[in-house]
């Protein structure tokens, strides 16, 4: 994982790249410089500067952690630390037991039995509107869904790299799981309890607290 490079306006950040947002090109030398303070980010041949403190900007496929803020009309609105709440449609979740069928009016009446206000969930960015920026998420994969028996931590989303795997397991005793949401929300949980409501043990609380404190120090 490459080191983060923090720059201020006027800092030289490279050459031979396509200049993205937060940069400008010197017309005489074609060198690329930062136009804002932030973190240098490169993807393919594009180089840009992301503001150090900004809202999360979603990409399709991002793994996220979010909090349900409202339930209505066959959908949930979810806080994902972005410029607007994300939408989770009833059709974009797994029904209990993994049943495959069309959602009906009865399901809409019992939506709070799936997720209710204040619940924490993991999911994936399904779509981002081209013109309105509307954020759609889904939890259809079995690895996503309701989160319990853990702690939520917020970090700067600009410091989180997009990786192949955002879900990790620490083989301590007891085992602790970590979900690094690309949106800056990090979830630390006791894996032995899974997603049930059984209280976690004192030993699990200590392990969770140790990992949480380590992340806070690094952030």
Task: Write out the residue ranges for each language-model feature.
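Single-stranded RNA-binding regions, centering on S1/OB-family and related RNA-binding modules
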Residues: 1-219
């Amino acid at each position: 994982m490459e080191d983060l490079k923090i720059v201020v306006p006027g800092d030289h950040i490279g050459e031979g790249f396509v200049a993205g947002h937060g940069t400008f090109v010197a017309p005489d030398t074609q060198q690329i410089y930062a136009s804002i303070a932030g973190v240098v980010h490169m993807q393919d041949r594009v180089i840009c500067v992301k503001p150090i403190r900004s809202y999360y900007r979603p990409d399709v496929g991002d793994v996220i952690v979010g909090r349900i803020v409202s339930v209505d009309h066959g959908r949930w609105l979810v806080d994902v630390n972005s410029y607007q709440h994300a939408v989770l449609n009833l059709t974009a979740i797994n029904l209990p037991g993994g049943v495959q069928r069309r959602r009906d009016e009865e399901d809409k009446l019992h939506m709070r039995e799936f997720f209710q206000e204040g619940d924490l969930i993991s999911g994936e960015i399904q779509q981002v509107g081209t013109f309105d920026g509307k954020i759609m998420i889904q939890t259809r994969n079995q690895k996503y869904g309701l989160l319990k028996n853990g702690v939520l931590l917020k970090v700067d989303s600009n410091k989180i790299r997009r990786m192949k795997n955002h879900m990790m397991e620490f083989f301590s005793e007891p085992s602790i799981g970590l979900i690094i949401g690309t949106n800056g929300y990090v979830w630390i949980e006791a894996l032995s309890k899974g997603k049930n409501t059984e209280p976690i043990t004192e030993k699990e609380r200590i392990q969770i607290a140790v990992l949480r404190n380590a992340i806070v120090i690094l952030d």
